[in-house]
């Protein structure tokens, strides 16, 4: 054993059939043993695992959870859209701002102008808030380049971030985020570029784990999204989708039928769409930050998701326009207060279900033997406090592959 954590109160998030507990129950006076970055022992204090003089970390009865996973972010961009925030407060709809060249295309212009190094330094600064909230894995999308070179530039930045010792990264190609201005009224030709040039080159450079699309009236049609999904799958990439955020185009059912790991936003998802998620074991990712910033009133169908036992993930959707929130714990609180999730559902949403949304459920999101040793150590008494309390520095340390990182 390389390192042993003792005197901790564990919230493992491991399934009940595997442990006899529900994963949310606090297991007091627990010990975790780590070897080569993996969990090798979890359980009651066991003197025998202290043989060999491992590094012993006394957690002093702190609460330990899996490291948090922010499974949907747009972390890499230049500029900001505070002016659009003001416009929306004056009553101008998001769709109208987008049609006038604002929205995503505003950020596209700024991001195209920025160098790779500039984008990297901006993104690393934004990570700090997420680290303080216990995040050990982050998903990062492209989607503000919308050309071959600029999408690759963004994904190269994400790859550089993945080389940091204290943050794991899952990368997503989101070239189908918006129609770039040079392809106005020629969106099918832009889809050709994505399928025939961008996806093959991204695969050649090994820059992405997933391909995502924005299936919406101001984005791309289900038929266009299906083409992108098929090209991604043909090149060995996994898929996910921004679906049913502003209307119901049945994009969630399409994505699920093609094997998507998750569909995200889903405010307008109906029962047929929920059934498709259940049939295909697709995660529903809730993004209350965007719901809040856009002052939406249409709630995701939480009762239906519960009825059909759909795993619900939660993410920041961190982006400059509709969710500039670099705090996953704030999002957990919003999921409870706005979407009426329980604190347990909220915690599952940023651990085991977030891992599943990225296809990482066999490696992260739980504290169990064989899983990667990623967890967060909190000065808290109960897991409900993670959703309940905001703005208090409760995090003692993050552990990534067994290595300890104390936050400032």
Curated annotation (Swiss-Prot):
Pfam families: Amidohydro_1. Catalyzes the hydrolytic cleavage of the carbon-nitrogen bond in imidazolone-5-propanoate to yield N-formimidoyl-L-glutamate. It is the third step in the universal histidine degradation pathway. Signal peptide: none annotated. Gene3D superfamilies: Metal-dependent hydrolases (3.20.20.140), Urease, subunit C, domain 1 (2.30.40.10). It comes from the Bacteria. GO terms for molecular function: imidazolonepropionase activity; iron ion binding; zinc ion binding. Belongs to the metallo-dependent hydrolases superfamily. HutI family. The keyword Zinc applies. It is found in: Cytoplasm. It catalyses: 4-imidazolone-5-propanoate + H2O = N-formimidoyl-L-glutamate. Its main location: cytoplasm. InterPro entries: Amidohydro-rel (IPR006680), HutI (IPR005920), Metal-dep_hydrolase_composite (IPR011059), Metal_Hydrolase (IPR032466). Keywords: Cytoplasm, Histidine metabolism, Hydrolase, Iron, Metal-binding, Zinc. Pathway: Amino-acid degradation; L-histidine degradation into L-glutamate; N-formimidoyl-L-glutamate from L-histidine: step 3/3. This is Imidazolonepropionase. Fe(3+) binds at residues 72, 74, 242, 317. N-formimidoyl-L-glutamate binds at residues 144, 319, 321. One of its GO terms (biological process) is L-histidine catabolic process to glutamate and formate. Zn(2+) binds at residues 72, 74, 242, 317. HAMAP family: HutI. Its EC number is 3.5.2.7. GO terms for cellular component: cytoplasm.
């Amino acid at each position: 054993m390389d390192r042993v954590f003792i005197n901790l109160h564990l919230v493992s998030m491991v399934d009940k059939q595997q442990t006899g507990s529900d994963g949310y129950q606090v297991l007091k006076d627990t010990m975790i043993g780590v070897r080569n970055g993996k969990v090798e022992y979890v359980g009651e204090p066991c003197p025998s695992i202290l043989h060999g003089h491992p590094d012993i970390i006394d957690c002093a009865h702190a609460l330990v959870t899996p490291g948090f996973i922010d499974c949907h972010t747009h972390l890499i961009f230049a500029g900001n859209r505070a002016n659009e925030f003001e416009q929306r407060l004056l009553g101008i709809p998001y769709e109208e701002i987008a049609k006038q060249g604002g929205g995503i295309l505003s950020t596209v212009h700024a991001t195209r102008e920025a160098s790779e190094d500039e984008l990297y330094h901006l993104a690393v600064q934004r990570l700090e808030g997420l680290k303080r909230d216990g995040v050990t894995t982050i998903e990062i999308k492209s989607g503000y380049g919308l050309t071959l070179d600029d999408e690759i530039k963004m994904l190269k930045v994400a790859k550089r971030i993945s080389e940091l010792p204290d943050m794991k990264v899952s990368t997503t190609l989101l070239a189908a985020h918006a129609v770039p201005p040079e392809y106005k009224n020629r969106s099918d030709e832009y889809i050709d570029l994505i399928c025939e040039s961008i996806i093959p080159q991204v695969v050649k450079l090994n820059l992405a784990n997933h391909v995502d699309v924005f299936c919406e009236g101001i984005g791309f049609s289900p038929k266009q999204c299906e083409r992108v999904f098929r090209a991604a799958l043909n090149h060995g990439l996994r898929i996910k989708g921004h679906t049913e955020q502003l209307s119901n185009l049945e994009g969630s059912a399409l994505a699920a039928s093609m094997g998507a790991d998750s569909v995200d936003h889903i405010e307008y998802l109906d029962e047929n769409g929920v059934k498709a998620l259940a049939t295909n074991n697709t995660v529903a990712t809730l993004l209350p930050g965007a719901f809040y910033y856009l002052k939406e009133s249409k709630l995701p169908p939480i009762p239906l998701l519960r009825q059909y036992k759909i795993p619900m993930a939660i993410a920041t959707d961190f982006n400059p326009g509709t969710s500039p929130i670099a705090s996953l714990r704030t999002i957990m609180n919003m999921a409870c207060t706005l979407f009426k999730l329980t604190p347990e559902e909220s915690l599952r949403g940023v651990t085991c279900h977030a891992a599943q949304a990225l296809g990482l459920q066999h490696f992260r999101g739980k504290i169990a033997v064989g899983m990667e040793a990623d967890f967060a150590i909190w000065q808290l008494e109960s897991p409900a406090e993670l959703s309940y309390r905001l703005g208090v520095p409760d995090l003692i340390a993050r552990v990534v592959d067994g290595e300890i990182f104390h936050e400032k």
